[in-house]
């Protein structure tokens, strides 16, 4: 089974971008262009447009903060040790433990009595508990990230 079956591309982009941001001094800003440039050192086909969409979703979910203006960019919405992979998954994937595996929802004739649904729900709960135990700080700690040349470390005026 491929790793990609458990994690969406959107989740992968977010994890990489957040780990990069966590390696910078707290309150430092990162632009989408900077994040995309670094991500292209990890995989050449990283899309800046797709990354921008992911970062905007993270901003709407409070994981990152948007800073407008000429010297704007994004910063982490809270300290990296306070952002779990579960937080990221919930913002990006809309995690729901009530989903029927056949997408029947409330119309399922076996609602509450389906062995498959109970088993899958149990697996999903365990998966989410595991994600909750891993912070962005832990993820970043195991990474060596070189900030691309020409990128300055800008601090948010709000911090």
What positions do the PLM features span?
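Short, Lys/Arg-enriched N-terminal segment that forms or immediately precedes the first helix
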Residues: 1-6
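N-terminal helix-turn-helix DNA-binding core of bacterial DNA-binding proteins
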Residues: 8-9, 13-46
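Basic amphipathic alpha-helical segments that dock to polyanions
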Residues: 51-61
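Beta-hairpin "wing" of winged helix-turn-helix
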Residues: 62-77
């Amino acid at each position: 089974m491929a790793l990609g079956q458990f994690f969406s591309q959107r989740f992968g982009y977010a994890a990489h971008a957040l780990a990069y941001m966590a390696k910078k001094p707290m309150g430092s800003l990162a632009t989408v262009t900077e994040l995309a440039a670094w991500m292209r050192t990890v995989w050449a086909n990283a899309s800046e447009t797709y990354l921008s969409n992911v970062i905007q979703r993270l901003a709407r979910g409070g994981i990152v903060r948007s800073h407008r203006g000429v010297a704007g960019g994004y910063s982490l919405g809270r300290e990296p040790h306070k952002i779990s992979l579960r937080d990221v998954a919930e913002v990006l994937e809309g995690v729901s433990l009530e989903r029927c595996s056949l997408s029947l929802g409330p119309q399922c004739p076996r609602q509450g009595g389906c062995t498959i649904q109970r088993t899958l729900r149990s697996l999903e709960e365990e998966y989410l508990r595991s994600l909750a135990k891993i912070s962005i700080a832990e993820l970043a700690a195991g990474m060596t990230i070189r900030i691309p040349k020409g990128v300055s470390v800008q601090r948010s005026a709000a911090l």
